[in-house]
């Protein structure tokens, strides 16, 4: 569970992981019921924040729901090795939803972890720029530490107002299969909990 406090010490958000790992010790946990966003007032202004925890990032729907609920920044506490494919998931969640994704991970001194905390700002193109840019604005190493990244929220908002990803051209009426609860081969698992 993630608990987010604002700079004044007020609890703003409590989020319980929706996608618990049914194939491991997390099978004994109760999954969360929903994804939430909250307006977080910072010294630089307000930003709409949501959260996913670790395995939630494996499901594009997690970030998409948060985007639809207004998230501009998704916080992602993590506890597993951050390798190229997991980093690619985070980059994709930021790109496809035009939002920032900030991940903190346990350092390499913790078993089965390797640090690699990151921030993707979600802005793939800059006005007047030539081609796309790398949205990764922070990639930490394996050591324990406090890592800071500057997120230009106004730039993100301008980008969201002009570009084509996110909710700009979706056709949700054609996505009925996404809410179908049936699971077919080859994806049936004995450990799955609905």
Task: List each language-model region with its residue ranges.
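CN hydrolase (nitrilase-like) catalytic-core segments centered on the catalytic cysteine
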Residues: 57-147
């Amino acid at each position: 569970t993630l608990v987010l406090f604002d700079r004044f010490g007020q609890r703003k958000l409590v989020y319980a992981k929706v996608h618990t790992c049914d194939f491991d010790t997390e099978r004994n946990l109760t999954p969360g019921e929903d994804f939430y966003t909250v307006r977080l007032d910072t010294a630089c202004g307000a930003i709409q924040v949501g959260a996913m925890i670790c395995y939630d990032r494996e499901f594009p729907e997690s970030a998409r729901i948060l985007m639809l609920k207004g998230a501009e920044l998704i916080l992602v506490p993590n506890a597993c090795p951050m390798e190229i494919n997991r980093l690619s998931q985070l980059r994709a969640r930021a790109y496809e939803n035009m939002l920032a994704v900030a991940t903190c991970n346990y350092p390499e001194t913790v078993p089965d972890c390797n640090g690699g905390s990151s921030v993707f700002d979600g802005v793939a193109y800059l006005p007047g720029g030539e081609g796309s840019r790398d949205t990764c604005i922070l990639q930490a190493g394996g050591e324990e530490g406090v890592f800071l990244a500057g997120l230009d929220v106004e730039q993100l908002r301008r980008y969201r107002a002009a570009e084509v990803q996110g909710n700009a051209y979706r056709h949700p009426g054609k996505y009925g299969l996404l809410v179908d609860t049936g699971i077919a081969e080859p994806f049936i698992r004995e450990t799955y909990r609905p």
